[in-house]
Amino acid sequence: MTEGTDNALLERFEQDIWSKVPHLEEGSETRVVNATPLVDMTADFKECAKTVFKLDLDNADLKVFGKMDSTLLTGSIKVRPAANIINDAIVTGKLRSGQTVIEATSGNFGIALGLLSKLGLNVIALVSRKLQEGVFEELRNGNTRTIDL
């Protein structure tokens, strides 16, 4: 952290966003990707093996897990880089309470940045008029102001 770090903003960010988004945590002996959403897909895998490949794995001692980024905040993998960029900006003092973040986006990254509104920051997304209405809705639901280009 630097002298200019907004510690109150960093604390809110870590509690409300960072703790819920997969990110690399480095300890003295380990490196762990925290909060990665895994779903047990064993039953589906066995059914697929039986149906598609005619393999009977019912008695096989195995577990199959899938990484399901659709279960992340915002439902998109784009929340990962957004959270890392936000974390770096807060830690280095580049992003502080009361500031506005402006992003040109076609959707998911802007939606992920919209999480900043939960921290009391303003987010403006510069978007194409041709963007799908569903994306506009998600941006607005996240309290992100949109400006059509």
Question: Each predicted region: which residue ranges?
Answer:
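PLP-dependent amino-acid enzyme catalytic core
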Residues: 1-149
